[in-house]
Amino acid sequence: MNFYQIKSPLTQITEEKTAGYIGALSEAFGEEFKRVSLEEYLHDDFSLLYVASGGSEGYFIEVFEQLKDKPCIILTSGDSNSLAASMEILSFLKQHGAEGEILHGSVTAIAERIRSLRNAYRAKAALKGKKIGVPGLADAATVV
């Protein structure tokens, strides 16, 4: 599972603390989480945006134009004002007509939600461009 990490340049959050949280989440999910570049994040069909600290919303606004066409699944650890920054980012997304969701809670609950979201995105991608009809009805409509 890929994630793009944003954090305030002023934060004192350590790589060890981030690695500990991401490691616990990887274990609960049953798959390794890999930090990727912004370019990799943008080209991945389904990946997470990890808000590692408060103050990250300023950086997010700087890269928003690149992200606006992709739903933002925002992962928060709850440490270092991560949740507050995530809420600011979600509010910004909503104000600009973009999609987003904050994942917050126990690592087990977050892992389950990620699994559900990824399955939904995979199903949506598999159905993209397909025509689905309802056979047997006199006025069966085709859903595009």
Positions of the model-derived regions?
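An N-terminal assembly and electron-transfer interface module characteristic of large anaerobic redox
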Residues: M1-V144
